[in-house]
Amino acid sequence: MKTIQGVVAAPQARVAIAISRFNHFINDSLLEGAIDALKRIGQVSDENITVVWVPGAYELPLTVRALASSGRYDAVVALGTVIRGGTAHFEFVAGECSSGLASVALNTDVPVAFGVLTTETIEQAIDRAGAKAGNKGAEAALTALEMINVLKAIKA
């Protein structure tokens, strides 16, 4: 029996991070966590990390598709925060962002790591951006690296 498991060390990996400016006070922490994980744990060099800022989470799928389709990146990490408000806006943005990012991964065969927080409150978002619940940006970055290695092993 053969077992394929990814590892997170990927020193030669080329990784793009697409990040939303909206709710930047939370997203900045997600970005710091992602970059730290890529460099410290994944051993990815600065020159192999590209950060692309977009207006909001709704714009992430299009940007991630452009990055994944460029052939310049082994994986893309999507970071953002969508906080529920008093209208249906949350469902539309969170749903379209999530399904759009999944579609990009399936249609490009490039790993897309989902680091978009979808929370009920600002406090929950802060907790998931490095406070009580870890840093989901770092987790997404490690997921991207692991998936690079899993897909390489499958194709080998």
Swiss-Prot record:
Quaternary structure annotation from Swiss-Prot or TrEMBL: Forms an icosahedral capsid composed of 60 subunits, arranged as a dodecamer of pentamers.
Disulphide bridges: none
Organism: Edwardsiella ictaluri (strain 93-146)
Keyword Hydrolase in record: no
Protein name as catalogued: 6,7-dimethyl-8-ribityllumazine synthase
EC number: 2.5.1.78
Described purpose of this protein according to its UniProt entry: Catalyzes the formation of 6,7-dimethyl-8-ribityllumazine by condensation of 5-amino-6-(D-ribitylamino)uracil with 3,4-dihydroxy-2-butanone 4-phosphate. This is the penultimate step in the biosynthesis of riboflavin.
GO biological process, one term: riboflavin biosynthetic process
Superkingdom of this protein's organism: Bacteria
Positions annotated to bind 5-amino-6-(D-ribitylamino)uracil: 22, 57-59, 81-83, 114
InterPro entries according to UniProt: LS, LS/RS, LS/RS_sf
Swiss-Prot/TrEMBL keywords: Riboflavin biosynthesis, Transferase
Presence of the UniProt keyword Transferase in the record: yes
Pathway where this protein functions: Cofactor biosynthesis; riboflavin biosynthesis; riboflavin from 2-hydroxy-3-oxobutyl phosphate and 5-amino-6-(D-ribitylamino)uracil: step 1/2
Active site: 89
Top enzyme class: transferase
Pfam families referenced in this protein's UniProt entry, alphabetically: DMRL_synthase
Family stated for the protein in its record: Belongs to the DMRL synthase family.
Residues annotated to bind (2S)-2-hydroxy-3-oxobutyl phosphate: 86-87, 128
GO cellular component annotations of the record: cytosol; riboflavin synthase complex
SUPFAM superfamilies: Lumazine synthase (SSF52121)
Catalysis: reaction(s): (2S)-2-hydroxy-3-oxobutyl phosphate + 5-amino-6-(D-ribitylamino)uracil = 6,7-dimethyl-8-(1-D-ribityl)lumazine + phosphate + 2 H2O + H(+)
